[in-house]
Amino acid sequence: MSKAEMVANKIKERFPNAEVVVKTNKWGRERVWVRISREEYKELMKFIRELDPEAHYSIGIEQDWGDELGFLNHILLFYDEPPGVSLLIDVHAPKDNPVLPDTSDIFPISLQFEREGMEMVGLDFEGAPDKRRLFLPDDFPEGIYPLRTDEKGVPEEMVKNAGHPYLLRREKK
C-alpha cells in the first residue's frame, strides 16, 4: 500500500461522509483528493496535523462554482520521507451563506489565502483573526468580488482596457 493510499484510508475511516479518491497524475505521482462538508472541514484539518505534525500547507484557492463557492487546499504530508503525499482538500459553501471555518489556528499560513478568498469571491472565514483586505485597495466597492462570475462580480462599467496589445482597437484615419 502506498503512503497516499494509507492517508486516503485513514481519512475515509475518520470521515466516512467525505469523498476520498487517490488519483495518479501524468507523471505517475499519486494525489489524494478529498471533498469534505464545511461542517467537518476544520476537524479534517486538525486530523491532518495529527497524521503529520509537520504537514506543509502549500496554498488555498478560492473558486466560483455557480451556486456554490469553493476553497481548495493543497497540503504536503510526509515530505521529509520521499515521496511525500500531495493532499487536496475541497470544501464548498452555498453563495447565500458563504461561511467556512477559519483554519489559521491549525495552519497559520492559511490565513493569507483565506483573506484572498474573502475579498476575491466573498467567502467568510468564521473566526479568522484578520479580515482586512490583502490585495484590493481600501476604496474598492464593498460587495463586489473580482473572481465571482455572477452579479456580485466586477460590473462591465468598472472594466477598463489597460492597453493590452491584443485588445486595443485602433482608430482608422
Curated annotation (Swiss-Prot):
EC number: 1.12.7.2
Any one GO cellular component localisation term in the record: plasma membrane
One GO term of the biological process aspect: proton motive force-driven ATP synthesis
Compartments it resides in: Cell membrane
Activity sensitivity to pH: Optimum pH is 7.0. Active between pH 6.0-8.5.
Pfam families from the UniProt entry: Complex1_30kDa
Cofactor details (free text): Binds 1 nickel ion per mole of protein.
Gene3D superfamilies in the cross-refs: NADH:ubiquinone oxidoreductase, 30kDa subunit (3.30.460.80)
Single GO molecular function: ferredoxin hydrogenase activity
Thermal dependence of function as given in the entry: Optimum temperature is 90 degrees Celsius for membrane-bound enzyme but 80 degrees Celsius for the purified enzyme. Membrane-bound enzyme has a half-life of 2h at 100 degrees Celsius whereas the half-life of the purified enzyme is 30 minutes at 100 degrees Celsius.
Names of required cofactors: Ni(2+)
Protein's UniProt keywords contain Oxidoreductase: yes
Regulation: Inhibited by 0.1 mM Cu(2+).
Key word Membrane present: yes
Subunit text: The membrane-bound hydrogenase complex is composed of MbhK and MbhL, and may also contain MbhJ.
Family note: Belongs to the complex I 30 kDa subunit family.
Stated role: Beta subunit of a hydrogen-evolving hydrogenase that utilizes protons both as a substrate for hydrogen production and proton translocation. Acts by coupling the redox reaction via ferredoxin and iron-sulfur (Fe-S) clusters to proton translocation across the membrane thereby conserving the redox energy in a proton gradient.
UniProt protein name: Membrane-bound hydrogenase subunit beta
Organism: Pyrococcus furiosus (strain ATCC 43587 / DSM 3638 / JCM 8422 / Vc1)
